[in-house]
Each structure stands twice: as structure tokens, then as C-alpha cells.
Amino acid sequence: MSSTTNSVKGKEVLKKLGELIPLNLAEKWDNVGLLVEPSNTDSMDIERIFLTNDLTEPVLQEAINEKASFIISYHPPLFNQFKTVNQKSISQRIAIKSIENRIPIYSPHSALDSCDGGLNDWISNALIKLNSGKGRSKPITPYQESLKSTQKISIYLHTNQPLTAEILKQLELNSNFQFYSTDKIELSCDQQQLLILINLIKSFSNEIKNWDIINQEKVLSLNNGSGKLVTLDDDGIDIDVIVKGVKELFNIEYVRIGRPLSGESKKIKTISLCAGSGGSVVFNAKADLYLTGELTHHAILDACAKGSYVIVCDHSNSERDYLPQILKPNLEKLFNGRIKVIVSKLDTDPLKVI
């Protein structure tokens, strides 16, 4: 990697961020991407990217003092729509001040949770390492990826009437061949190609027995999606080992733990996890342990009554250390050392144990 810090145009920064963290993975309710855009952001020379989990007013001033030219705030500082722009609300003051100082603000939020190599992968990989690397993880709710070829067509042929070279050529020009034999052809196409193919198939109807179309607009992703379900191989590990590992990963002194109400002590083989507020995600999978930033009182009671452990760490404690551990080096590599990446020193969880 080059050690020379130079600059990158704003347009390229936005493009590369979108490639690293695809925004289409964000939850529908979320507010992600470029949230504050000073004029001519595309042509700006971005020299210093400032990372924070929460963009508070003191953290924004820290970014200004650090001469940041671009802010990535994991949590979106702007969420609700507003009809006026004034100094009455914190979020609007942050937006105004960032524009006055010509600093764009970008938030990846739930897209970073769900992407391959994102926040939940960071946590699941650390848990698997506690078991000597023996285990695997998958999304609790896999992302449904759109396909370029949205239609699959199967054509069943009379074995004694092979298709002519001209017909095969026309099929190939208007679709993607997936399978071909003397009695069957499988191909895929997009919606625009479909009508052309239907008319083409009708033109050689004497050569075929029948044909069908399957809509395949969505496919489940193997790596992208909400939360992670971790399965540990062999006998699993003790809850105390996981508690220690979680504290070290999140760089915190304390976690809160709920134990099975039966008093039963058991090894942990399955862990359902989600950074932040994961109550709507983690309980979609049955697990020995539920790990997240925050849960409601009754959700914890219910899980413990069903014989599971629960670990909650406070919301942003389960997210913050991803920035220096993973995102900072990833961005330095992404921009080949041409941008200096700074992590906030003031950003911290608002709740403290005393």
C-alpha cells in the first residue's frame, strides 16, 4: 500500500463506498448514503475521512478541528423529514454546521450491518475464533438479490427432431444458455427479451413437445442479510468464554447476561446475533445464546424462560469498535493510502455503568 496521502475526488469516494458497502442492502426504513451534500461535492478533493459511530455536536466539532473533508457516521444523524432549517433541533444544527464547513456526511448504517464483511460478520468471526476457528455463520434473514436474468425458460424437444443451427443461433442471440441436450433446452432472459423468445419458440412449435416459464426475479444471498446465526462445531464453548471474548471484542468492561430460568448450565453451540438493537432480528432463529446491543425486558424474560442465554452490551457498544478494527483499514486499502482516515476519540456510548 502506498504511504503517500494525497486526495480523491468526491465522486470517486461515493462510487467506491457504494461498491464496498452496497446501499441496496439497507433496511427499507433506514436513511443511508449521502445525507448532507454541500455544493460541488463530486468535484471536492477529499483528503481526510472522519469516522464516528454517532455524530453528535461535540464530535462534529472534533471533525472540524481535525480538518476532515468527509464524515462517515455509522448512525444517520438525519432521520426525520423537516419543513424548516433552523437552530432549534440538534440534527438540523449538525447539518447546517457541516454545510457551513463544506463537509459531506455519509451514513451506511444497516447496509454495513448486512453486507459481506460487515458489522455482523465481524462479531460472528470473532465468536468462531473462540472455538479455534471451528464453526460457520449465515444470515438470519438472507437478502433477496435481484437477478439480471429474471425469467427461466425450459423447452422440451422431440428427440427425433433436433433444432436447426439457425434456430439455436436465434435463441443464443436473445438469451443466456444454461443447459442443452437432445431433448431439453434451458435458458434465461430478462423481461425485455421474453416476448422475443416467446414469438421465436412459437415459430418452431413443430419441433417441441412443450415449454414453460419460471419467474426468478429474486435469489437468496449466501452472505448478505440481517443478523448472523453462528453454529460452533464439536461440543461448543462455555458461556464464560463467550462473555470474556465479547468484552475484548467490544473493548468494554461489562456486559449484561441473562441465564436460563431453569438454572441449567450448558455449552453454547448456536448464537443468534445482531449489532445494535437486534430484537426484531435475533429471535427469528432458535439459538442457545442471543447476542445484541439492546433488548426489551420481556424479550429477555421470554428467551431465558425457553432455556437460552442472553447477552446485551448497550446499543452502540456492539458497533463502535468495528470502525478502528475493520472499517479504517478497509478504507485505507480501498483508496490506496491516498486519503487519511481518522477515527473519533470523543465518540462514546451515552450510557455508563457507575
UniProtKB/Swiss-Prot annotation:
InterPro entries assigned to the protein according to its UniProt record, in alphabetical order: DUF34/NIF3 (IPR002678), DUF34/NIF3_animal (IPR017222), DUF34/NIF3_sf (IPR036069)
Pfam short name (any one): DUF34_NIF3
Top-level division of the source organism's lineage: Eukaryota
This protein's GO CC annotations: cytoplasm; mitochondrion
NCBIfam families tied to this protein: YbgI_SA1388
PANTHER family: NGG1 INTERACTING FACTOR 3, NIF3-LIKE PROTEIN 1
Family: Belongs to the GTP cyclohydrolase I type 2/NIF3 family.
Protein name per its UniProtKB record: NIF3-like protein 1
